[in-house]
């Protein structure tokens, strides 16, 4: 029978296993007692930490709960539109009071005494098939029933649509390690800035500034201190001397200039007042006689 004639599902839940998450939808309206039993045992933690341990390759993957509690046997619920006609369907084993998931496409001929009440939806079918591919133990209780060496474990459940009024929707209870992963990362505290502060700078009032330790100074002997002090006194005295020397030098230079100017003036006056000597007079006389001789004569012939 094709799945397009199946009735609409009315309840939903998510199984969180160690191999991945499996989304399940239930026909709570068509199989009310079976679906209510399944959701009740999920919500009260009966199935928590149970294992998908046993596999019958021709029929089902059985869920093995640690305890089924004191629940009475579920009544038989049949619907002509819902049948075991493919893999990934949920069935209830009324004799063992637990549930399973079908493996083969058509196993209705061996599951007539079980109630079909739900199905795996979406991409969860690939998680289910991955569970089926787990490693099988070498020895088994029965030749037909195999046991997984590392079975998938049901760690938590989430009922998203309970359908029944006395069953409330539940959110997933996170494990401790998952809570740590989902905790928001703490903001990194910025480290205080380090600023170099020198002795000749004013202190900074910024609270984030950390001052460096003052540098160590060398302690000089007493005799070096005395010499440095005396040299400092001499240096201070010598700082005033250049100004006095400059003033004195300017005054002396001015006096020397005035004295030189006076001497030059006096020498010029003495030159004007001195009479011509004998040789100069003789030279002038000879020049006068020469001029008289050549007067009116053409000496260029």
Swiss-Prot record:
EC number(s)? 5.2.1.8
**Domain of life, per the record?**
Eukaryota
- Provide the alphabetized UniProt keywords: Cytoplasm, Isomerase, mRNA processing, mRNA splicing, Nucleus, Rotamase, Spliceosome
- Which parts of this chain are annotated as the region Disordered? 251-280
Compartment annotation: Cytoplasm; Nucleus
Limits of the PPIase cyclophilin-type domain = 9-159
Major place of residence: cytoplasm
Mention one GO molecular function.
peptidyl-prolyl cis-trans isomerase activity
**What does it catalyze?**
[protein]-peptidylproline (omega=180) = [protein]-peptidylproline (omega=0)
Checking InterPro entries in the record gives: Cyclophilin-like_dom_sf, Cyclophilin-type_PPIase_dom, Cyclophilin_A-like
Example GO BP:
mRNA splicing, via spliceosome
* Gene Ontology annotations for the cellular component aspect, listed alphabetically: catalytic step 2 spliceosome; cytoplasm; Prp19 complex; U2-type spliceosomal complex
UniProt family annotation: Belongs to the cyclophilin-type PPIase family. CWC27 subfamily.
The entry's function note states: PPIases accelerate the folding of proteins. Catalyzes the cis-trans isomerization of proline imidic peptide bonds in oligopeptides. Involved in pre-mRNA splicing.
Indicate the quaternary assembly: Belongs to the CWC complex (or CEF1-associated complex), a spliceosome subcomplex composed of the U2, U5 and U6 snRNAs and at least BUD13, BUD31, BRR2, CDC40, CEF1, CLF1, CUS1, CWC2, CWC15, CWC21, CWC22, CWC23, CWC24, CWC25, CWC27, ECM2, HSH155, IST3, ISY1, LEA1, MSL1, NTC20, PRP8, PRP9, PRP11, PRP19, PRP21, PRP22, PRP45, PRP46, SLU7, SMB1, SMD1, SMD2, SMD3, SMX2, SMX3, SNT309, SNU114, SPP2, SYF1, SYF2, RSE1 and YJU2.
The molecule here is called Peptidyl-prolyl isomerase CWC27
